Amino acid sequence: MTVLHSVDFFPSGNASVAIEPRLPQADFPEHHHDFHEIVIVEHGTGIHVFNGQPYTITGGTVCFVRDHDRHLYEHTDNLCLTNVLYRSPDRFQFLAGLNQLLPQELDGQYPSHWRVNHSVLQQVRQLVAQMEQQEGENDLPSTASREILFMQLLLLLRKSSLQENLENSASRLNLLLAWLEDHFADEVNWDAVADQFSLSLRTLHRQLKQQTGLTPQRYLNRLRLMKARHLLRHSEASVTDIAYRCGFSDSNHFSTLFRREFNWSPRDIRQGRDGFLQ
Protein backbone atom coordinates (compact mmCIF):
# COMPACT_ATOMS: atom_id res chain seq x y z
CA MET A 1 0.00 0.00 0.00
CA THR A 2 1.22 3.49 -0.87
CA VAL A 3 2.29 5.68 2.06
CA LEU A 4 2.27 9.46 1.61
CA HIS A 5 4.84 11.33 3.73
CA SER A 6 4.50 14.78 5.25
CA VAL A 7 7.93 15.85 3.98
CA ASP A 8 6.51 15.79 0.43
CA PHE A 9 3.51 18.02 1.20
CA PHE A 10 4.28 20.46 4.01
CA PRO A 11 6.21 23.60 2.96
CA SER A 12 8.64 23.34 5.88
CA GLY A 13 9.53 21.06 8.76
CA ASN A 14 7.74 23.20 11.31
CA ALA A 15 4.62 23.97 9.26
CA SER A 16 1.54 22.64 11.05
CA VAL A 17 -0.92 23.05 8.13
CA ALA A 18 -0.67 22.62 4.34
CA ILE A 19 -3.18 22.98 1.50
CA GLU A 20 -3.21 20.42 -1.30
CA PRO A 21 -5.77 21.02 -4.10
CA ARG A 22 -6.85 18.17 -6.37
CA LEU A 23 -8.60 19.82 -9.30
CA PRO A 24 -9.61 17.28 -10.43
CA GLN A 25 -8.95 14.21 -8.31
CA ALA A 26 -8.50 11.16 -10.53
CA ASP A 27 -9.00 7.60 -9.36
CA PHE A 28 -6.27 6.91 -6.80
CA PRO A 29 -5.30 3.56 -5.23
CA GLU A 30 -5.55 2.73 -1.55
CA HIS A 31 -3.07 4.66 0.59
CA HIS A 32 -2.50 6.18 3.99
CA HIS A 33 -0.34 9.02 5.33
CA ASP A 34 1.86 9.94 8.26
CA PHE A 35 -0.32 13.05 8.72
CA HIS A 36 -4.03 13.86 9.07
CA GLU A 37 -6.23 15.59 6.51
CA ILE A 38 -9.64 17.16 6.02
CA VAL A 39 -10.96 16.39 2.54
CA ILE A 40 -13.36 19.04 1.22
CA VAL A 41 -15.31 18.08 -1.91
CA GLU A 42 -15.83 21.17 -4.07
CA HIS A 43 -17.95 19.53 -6.76
CA GLY A 44 -18.28 16.41 -8.91
CA THR A 45 -18.91 12.88 -7.69
CA GLY A 46 -16.97 9.76 -6.83
CA ILE A 47 -16.65 6.83 -4.49
CA HIS A 48 -14.47 7.22 -1.43
CA VAL A 49 -13.55 3.82 0.01
CA PHE A 50 -12.62 4.59 3.61
CA ASN A 51 -11.19 1.77 5.74
CA GLY A 52 -12.83 -0.69 3.36
CA GLN A 53 -16.28 0.96 3.32
CA PRO A 54 -17.52 2.80 0.19
CA TYR A 55 -19.12 6.25 0.48
CA THR A 56 -20.60 8.28 -2.35
CA ILE A 57 -19.13 11.79 -2.21
CA THR A 58 -20.44 14.94 -3.89
CA GLY A 59 -20.03 18.70 -3.49
CA GLY A 60 -20.33 19.56 0.19
CA THR A 61 -18.96 16.27 1.52
CA VAL A 62 -16.26 16.73 4.16
CA CYS A 63 -14.15 13.76 5.27
CA PHE A 64 -11.83 13.63 8.26
CA VAL A 65 -8.91 11.27 7.63
CA ARG A 66 -6.59 10.27 10.48
CA ASP A 67 -2.99 9.14 10.07
CA HIS A 68 -3.91 5.46 10.50
CA ASP A 69 -6.91 5.46 8.14
CA ARG A 70 -6.58 3.96 4.67
CA HIS A 71 -8.63 5.20 1.74
CA LEU A 72 -8.92 5.37 -2.04
CA TYR A 73 -10.92 7.17 -4.73
CA GLU A 74 -12.64 5.43 -7.61
CA HIS A 75 -15.31 6.04 -10.26
CA THR A 76 -14.58 9.77 -10.10
CA ASP A 77 -16.53 12.14 -12.34
CA ASN A 78 -15.12 15.70 -12.42
CA LEU A 79 -14.33 15.26 -8.73
CA CYS A 80 -12.57 18.34 -7.35
CA LEU A 81 -11.16 18.27 -3.82
CA THR A 82 -9.21 20.51 -1.51
CA ASN A 83 -7.19 18.67 1.13
CA VAL A 84 -6.32 20.55 4.31
CA LEU A 85 -3.38 18.66 5.79
CA TYR A 86 -2.25 18.85 9.41
CA ARG A 87 0.37 16.81 11.21
CA SER A 88 -1.66 15.88 14.29
CA PRO A 89 -4.27 17.49 16.59
CA ASP A 90 -1.53 17.98 19.20
CA ARG A 91 1.19 19.31 16.85
CA PHE A 92 0.08 22.95 16.71
CA GLN A 93 2.28 25.68 18.10
CA PHE A 94 -0.45 28.03 19.32
CA LEU A 95 -3.51 25.79 19.68
CA ALA A 96 -4.48 23.13 22.23
CA GLY A 97 -7.54 20.93 22.63
CA LEU A 98 -8.34 20.76 18.90
CA ASN A 99 -9.24 17.10 19.20
CA GLN A 100 -12.50 18.13 20.88
CA LEU A 101 -13.66 19.77 17.63
CA LEU A 102 -12.89 16.73 15.48
CA PRO A 103 -15.10 13.66 14.98
CA GLN A 104 -14.73 11.15 17.80
CA GLU A 105 -14.73 7.38 17.47
CA LEU A 106 -17.32 5.77 19.77
CA ASP A 107 -17.82 2.02 20.19
CA GLY A 108 -15.82 1.38 17.03
CA GLN A 109 -17.88 3.84 14.95
CA TYR A 110 -16.06 6.83 13.48
CA PRO A 111 -18.28 9.53 11.87
CA SER A 112 -15.73 10.33 9.18
CA HIS A 113 -18.03 11.87 6.55
CA TRP A 114 -19.94 15.10 7.18
CA ARG A 115 -21.90 17.29 4.79
CA VAL A 116 -22.26 21.07 4.56
CA ASN A 117 -24.48 23.18 2.34
CA HIS A 118 -23.40 25.42 -0.53
CA SER A 119 -23.24 28.67 1.44
CA VAL A 120 -21.02 27.06 4.08
CA LEU A 121 -18.83 25.60 1.34
CA GLN A 122 -18.26 29.15 0.07
CA GLN A 123 -17.11 30.23 3.54
CA VAL A 124 -14.84 27.18 3.74
CA ARG A 125 -13.24 28.15 0.42
CA GLN A 126 -12.50 31.64 1.72
CA LEU A 127 -10.78 30.33 4.86
CA VAL A 128 -8.76 27.81 2.85
CA ALA A 129 -7.72 30.51 0.37
CA GLN A 130 -6.43 32.66 3.23
CA MET A 131 -4.41 29.74 4.61
CA GLU A 132 -3.01 29.03 1.16
CA GLN A 133 -1.93 32.66 0.68
CA GLN A 134 0.20 32.48 3.82
CA GLU A 135 1.92 29.15 3.13
CA GLY A 136 5.23 30.73 2.17
CA GLU A 137 5.54 32.70 5.42
CA ASN A 138 7.37 31.04 8.33
CA ASP A 139 7.51 33.85 10.90
CA LEU A 140 5.61 33.50 14.18
CA PRO A 141 2.75 35.90 13.32
CA SER A 142 2.07 34.05 10.04
CA THR A 143 2.18 30.67 11.78
CA ALA A 144 -0.24 31.93 14.42
CA SER A 145 -2.52 33.36 11.74
CA ARG A 146 -2.65 30.06 9.82
CA GLU A 147 -3.44 28.14 12.98
CA ILE A 148 -6.21 30.58 13.89
CA LEU A 149 -7.69 30.13 10.40
CA PHE A 150 -7.53 26.36 10.87
CA MET A 151 -9.41 26.72 14.17
CA GLN A 152 -12.02 28.87 12.41
CA LEU A 153 -12.38 26.17 9.76
CA LEU A 154 -13.01 23.48 12.37
CA LEU A 155 -15.55 25.66 14.18
CA LEU A 156 -17.37 26.44 10.93
CA LEU A 157 -17.53 22.78 9.92
CA ARG A 158 -18.71 21.65 13.33
CA LYS A 159 -21.41 24.32 13.65
CA SER A 160 -22.59 23.78 10.08
CA SER A 161 -22.53 19.99 9.92
CA LEU A 162 -25.76 18.07 9.53
CA GLN A 163 -25.83 17.19 13.19
CA GLU A 164 -26.39 20.82 14.13
CA ASN A 165 -27.98 22.65 11.18
CA LEU A 166 -31.29 21.70 9.56
CA GLU A 167 -32.65 25.19 9.03
CA ASN A 168 -32.88 25.17 5.23
CA SER A 169 -33.77 22.80 2.42
CA ALA A 170 -30.14 22.41 1.29
CA SER A 171 -29.17 21.09 4.72
CA ARG A 172 -32.17 18.76 4.78
CA LEU A 173 -31.19 17.44 1.35
CA ASN A 174 -27.70 16.70 2.66
CA LEU A 175 -29.26 14.80 5.56
CA LEU A 176 -31.36 12.85 3.06
CA LEU A 177 -28.23 11.90 1.10
CA ALA A 178 -26.59 10.69 4.30
CA TRP A 179 -29.75 8.70 5.09
CA LEU A 180 -29.60 7.03 1.66
CA GLU A 181 -26.05 5.85 2.39
CA ASP A 182 -27.48 3.76 5.24
CA HIS A 183 -30.81 2.77 3.64
CA PHE A 184 -29.86 2.25 -0.03
CA ALA A 185 -31.15 -1.34 0.02
CA ASP A 186 -34.60 -0.35 1.31
CA GLU A 187 -37.60 0.10 -0.96
CA VAL A 188 -37.64 3.88 -1.38
CA ASN A 189 -40.88 5.81 -1.82
CA TRP A 190 -39.75 9.28 -2.87
CA ASP A 191 -42.96 10.98 -1.72
CA ALA A 192 -42.53 9.50 1.75
CA VAL A 193 -38.81 10.32 1.83
CA ALA A 194 -39.50 13.93 0.80
CA ASP A 195 -42.02 14.22 3.64
CA GLN A 196 -39.59 12.61 6.09
CA PHE A 197 -37.05 15.35 5.41
CA SER A 198 -39.58 18.20 5.15
CA LEU A 199 -38.96 18.75 1.44
CA SER A 200 -41.44 19.05 -1.38
CA LEU A 201 -40.96 16.41 -4.07
CA ARG A 202 -40.26 19.16 -6.60
CA THR A 203 -37.55 20.66 -4.35
CA LEU A 204 -36.03 17.22 -3.75
CA HIS A 205 -35.77 16.54 -7.50
CA ARG A 206 -34.41 19.99 -8.33
CA GLN A 207 -31.80 20.23 -5.59
CA LEU A 208 -30.57 16.65 -5.89
CA LYS A 209 -30.16 17.14 -9.65
CA GLN A 210 -28.25 20.39 -9.03
CA GLN A 211 -25.94 18.79 -6.46
CA THR A 212 -25.27 15.42 -8.10
CA GLY A 213 -26.29 15.83 -11.74
CA LEU A 214 -28.68 12.89 -11.32
CA THR A 215 -32.39 12.38 -10.74
CA PRO A 216 -33.26 10.84 -7.35
CA GLN A 217 -33.87 7.36 -8.75
CA ARG A 218 -30.77 7.51 -10.93
CA TYR A 219 -28.73 8.57 -7.89
CA LEU A 220 -30.17 5.71 -5.82
CA ASN A 221 -29.48 3.18 -8.59
CA ARG A 222 -25.88 4.37 -8.90
CA LEU A 223 -25.43 4.20 -5.13
CA ARG A 224 -26.77 0.63 -5.09
CA LEU A 225 -24.52 -0.35 -8.00
CA MET A 226 -21.46 1.16 -6.29
CA LYS A 227 -22.20 -0.81 -3.11
CA ALA A 228 -22.70 -3.96 -5.19
CA ARG A 229 -19.41 -3.48 -7.02
CA HIS A 230 -17.62 -3.14 -3.67
CA LEU A 231 -19.17 -6.41 -2.45
CA LEU A 232 -18.26 -8.18 -5.70
CA ARG A 233 -14.64 -7.21 -5.12
CA HIS A 234 -14.43 -7.80 -1.40
CA SER A 235 -16.88 -10.58 -0.48
CA GLU A 236 -17.59 -14.17 -1.48
CA ALA A 237 -21.38 -13.70 -1.78
CA SER A 238 -23.01 -14.77 -5.05
CA VAL A 239 -24.03 -12.23 -7.68
CA THR A 240 -27.70 -12.97 -6.98
CA ASP A 241 -27.28 -12.52 -3.23
CA ILE A 242 -25.39 -9.25 -3.72
CA ALA A 243 -28.12 -7.97 -6.04
CA TYR A 244 -30.77 -8.59 -3.37
CA ARG A 245 -28.60 -7.18 -0.58
CA CYS A 246 -28.21 -3.96 -2.56
CA GLY A 247 -31.90 -3.40 -3.21
CA PHE A 248 -32.46 -5.15 -6.55
CA SER A 249 -35.33 -7.64 -6.70
CA ASP A 250 -34.29 -9.09 -10.08
CA SER A 251 -30.70 -10.26 -10.59
CA ASN A 252 -31.01 -10.11 -14.39
CA HIS A 253 -32.14 -6.48 -14.23
CA PHE A 254 -29.28 -5.82 -11.82
CA SER A 255 -26.75 -7.31 -14.25
CA THR A 256 -28.13 -5.18 -17.10
CA LEU A 257 -27.90 -1.97 -15.08
CA PHE A 258 -24.46 -2.94 -13.79
CA ARG A 259 -23.02 -3.44 -17.27
CA ARG A 260 -24.60 -0.19 -18.45
CA GLU A 261 -23.02 1.72 -15.54
CA PHE A 262 -19.52 0.21 -15.53
CA ASN A 263 -19.11 -1.39 -18.99
CA TRP A 264 -18.27 -4.64 -17.18
CA SER A 265 -20.54 -7.47 -16.06
CA PRO A 266 -20.76 -8.44 -12.37
CA ARG A 267 -18.85 -11.61 -13.21
CA ASP A 268 -16.08 -9.57 -14.86
CA ILE A 269 -15.68 -7.50 -11.68
CA ARG A 270 -15.71 -10.60 -9.50
CA GLN A 271 -12.86 -12.06 -11.57
CA GLY A 272 -10.87 -8.80 -11.59
CA ARG A 273 -11.04 -8.35 -15.35
CA ASP A 274 -11.38 -4.59 -14.98
CA GLY A 275 -7.81 -4.53 -13.65
CA PHE A 276 -8.72 -3.63 -10.06
CA LEU A 277 -7.32 -6.87 -8.64
CA GLN A 278 -4.22 -6.94 -10.81
Curated annotation (Swiss-Prot):
Domain HTH araC/xylS-type intervals: 174-272
A Pfam family the protein falls into: AraC_binding
Annotated consequence of substituting F254A: 1.2% of wild-type activity
Effect caused by changing G247R: 0.9% of wild-type activity
Inducers of expression: Induced by RhaR in response to L-rhamnose. Binding of the cAMP receptor protein (CRP) is required for full expression.
Effect of L201A: 48% of wild-type activity
Site (Interaction with sigma-70): D241, D250
InterPro entries given in the database record: AraC-bd (IPR003313), AraC_XylS_family_regulators (IPR050204), Homeodomain-like_sf (IPR009057), HTH-like (IPR037923), HTH_AraC (IPR018060), HTH_AraC-typ_CS (IPR018062), RhaR_RhaS-like_N (IPR047220), RmlC-like_jellyroll (IPR014710)
Effect of N252S: 37% of wild-type activity
Protein name: HTH-type transcriptional activator RhaS
Subunit structure: Binds DNA as a dimer.
